């Protein structure tokens, strides 16, 4: 049974299934909605079954490996595999995409194209996490680009074209560096041409070449993460995109940047990574503090949450740069945690907009009286975002914090300074999140509150599904860390051994 092509099936099924959408007999979009939800459920069920039945928690090498020669002259292989770095993100992708199809239920404008793009994006995102061929990685990275552009430009707000154009310009610029790196690394060295990422991880490069490759990849993945100063596309895109698209962006797309930094920059270019690591920590600290302060100043609800995402992804940069097992484990857990929390906050922001028809915080207020269920859900997700003990974010940030403090790669002075700034950023988080809750749900009611409708069964179900793993991981972190801890420890040891 393990010889079954699990990964090819999981990756290609959403895209192939989406091709049937134009021929579905449907006038109002109901059939299309149920069809897309069914595709998401089937694919996520396959992922869950593969993981539960066959995944080996102790193994650090690739599992479910598929390697088929695709284009021989180009040395291009259909090479797939998962390990501890990719398996939790594959699970996260399937889970959030399935919920996003349900979140998109109110979309009435051309639902056929909307769900077609969502499923195509699903394939691209899964592909990024499972492919093991560097050129194929680039192709999958690009596959999700066009669907996001169309989802934002066709179903966004008033400034959707500006936001979509800004998104594609930033990401296309980053993609150029990925392509250059993907066409350079395989042809260097005496071992022969190969795009296999596992082989390239042990290939020797001169330090100047490694630094150039690392810089290009860092720019590309920094855009996706996003890292300051290449982050400005994110607030605009989140501010204009439909909230179901925001769930996919915050929950999955940002994680592609963090994953690629670990898989390619850290694992394949260890010498350059050691040189850049202090800068990663510095940028991570800037992410946390600058984005937290900027979030506090935002008047738009979705932009406020978007800047909070930039702040939280700073912990991922610090964990990756810490050169410690605890730090990298924390970075992985932060990606999982933020994927769940970010998706829940954007979903709630969108459903609140559906009722109030505004995202300007000054035009809201006093909603707790009229929308108690929305208030309770928003409060729970906000507390999770500020890393309340018992929630997934707490243990993630704690691991990153400990990873930096205990790292032997840096001087005590550097660790102390960065730790102080990191702590300041942690203290800023509750300021902007609790301020957001106060502006939304407390104070004087504005507008016509009698017309407001509280969260319905669909909204409660979606947020509850996200809160269950947030609480589960917060109470028992090993639910998540057991999936990847052996692999992340192996990656850290690989980097440290390369430096000896």
UniProtKB/Swiss-Prot annotation:
Keyword Iron among record annotations: no
Location of this chain's protein in the cell: Plastid, Chloroplast thylakoid membrane
Listed Pfam families: Proton_antipo_M (PF00361)
EC number: 7.1.1.-
Transmembrane spans: 4-24, 32-52, 87-107, 113-133, 134-154, 167-187, 211-231, 242-262, 274-294, 305-325, 330-350, 374-396, 417-437, 460-480
Keywords from the named record: Chloroplast, Membrane, NAD, NADP, Plastid, Plastoquinone, Quinone, Thylakoid, Translocase, Transmembrane, Transmembrane helix
Catalytically driven reaction(s): a plastoquinone + NADH + (n+1) H(+)(in) = a plastoquinol + NAD(+) + n H(+)(out); a plastoquinone + NADPH + (n+1) H(+)(in) = a plastoquinol + NADP(+) + n H(+)(out)
Protein name (database record): NAD(P)H-quinone oxidoreductase chain 4, chloroplastic
Lineage of source species: Eukaryota, Viridiplantae, Chlorophyta, Nephroselmidophyceae, Nephroselmidales
